[in-house]
Amino acid sequence: MFAAVLDTCVLWPSLQRDIILTLAAHRFFKPLWSIEILEELEFHETRKLIDHGIPSQAAELRAQRLVKKMKMHFPKSVVL
């Protein structure tokens, strides 16, 4: 299985992220990312949700939950 670093520009569009992570879950490849990439993803996901009218606290919680689920489902994906 090959590995690929997924930057925020790949992970941030929701539909694109869902498709790519579904492929990873089916072991087509191993996703890799850094803590910085996940932090950037969380920031941009929060901003997007706020821009769509979600209250800031709820937006932050949803973005945090997204990153937490990614870490849970792909625990060996964080690289330095």
Where are these regions (language model features)?
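Active-site-proximal, substrate-binding regions of enzyme catalytic domains
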Residues: 3-4, 8-80
